[in-house]
């Protein structure tokens, strides 16, 4: 398989979730071995996608370097991961990626519009060689060897609508677009009110978030699918795993995982070379599996 980028530049304008201000997003092609590079066009600062540049994971995954930050990168990166894009410039003129409808669906449509272009360099894939696990109280994230990417996620909320949900997702681009991309972020009305009181979630609304009160969903249209809550967590995890800089072959398992735990997992994987192998020229069986996944 070859490395990829996009065929041509595409752009959109949306609202940032926390600041609530318009943000212009531009995706541009990059050459081979350039990786994923974010760019603050208002500041003239490049922010390469690297684990050491992740500076905050409380409310979202935040990239930072010097005086520049870009927040809520995970939904766009999830789509980039699913489309198998290796090299891409992502420019924004403010400190957030636009939230759009709270899912990755808009970004999938944007990438479809841009098209995928092969480059004259072999694709790099990270194969997990031994289990790596991060725990925090009863919460955990874990990745272990597998011949494909699969994500097993369980959430458990003390809420009558969500309760306990689990989903086993075997990655393919097609399955991602059908099961995961449309799943929206969600939050609780009490938390939203608090966040707004401290100057956050100014761009949040029923148009870009599933909002729940104590007993029900406030969005009149309801859910897009039965497991939308846990599928959004899978969406987030795929975005956070993209911080590794390349597609991953491994079995990811999580119970009540978070951006924080995912970021810790990424750094733990890279901390020991025995945990992984970067496949430059995959053997025929593995290459066929990858081609099938990203078709």
From Swiss-Prot:
Residues the record lists as binding Zn(2+): 75, 232, 236
Active site: 259
Keywords for this protein: Hydrolase, Lipid A biosynthesis, Lipid biosynthesis, Lipid metabolism, Metal-binding, Zinc
InterPro entries cross-referenced by the UniProt entry: Ribosomal_Su5_D2-typ_SF, UDP-acyl_GlcNac_deAcase, UDP-acyl_GlcNac_deAcase_C, UDP-acyl_N-AcGlcN_deAcase_N
Pathway recorded for this protein: Glycolipid biosynthesis; lipid IV(A) biosynthesis; lipid IV(A) from (3R)-3-hydroxytetradecanoyl-[acyl-carrier-protein] and UDP-N-acetyl-alpha-D-glucosamine: step 2/6
Catalyzed reactions: a UDP-3-O-[(3R)-3-hydroxyacyl]-N-acetyl-alpha-D-glucosamine + H2O = a UDP-3-O-[(3R)-3-hydroxyacyl]-alpha-D-glucosamine + acetate
Enzyme class: hydrolase
Enzyme Commission identifier(s): 3.5.1.108
Positions in coiled-coil regions: none
Cofactor(s) needed: Zn(2+)
GO molecular function, one term: metal ion binding
GO cellular component: membrane
GO process terms (BP): lipid A biosynthetic process
Free-text function comment from the UniProt entry: Catalyzes the hydrolysis of UDP-3-O-myristoyl-N-acetylglucosamine to form UDP-3-O-myristoylglucosamine and acetate, the committed step in lipid A biosynthesis.
Similarity comment: family membership: Belongs to the LpxC family.
Name of the protein this chain belongs to: UDP-3-O-acyl-N-acetylglucosamine deacetylase
Organism: Helicobacter pylori (strain ATCC 700392 / 26695) (Campylobacter pylori)
Gene of this entry: lpxC
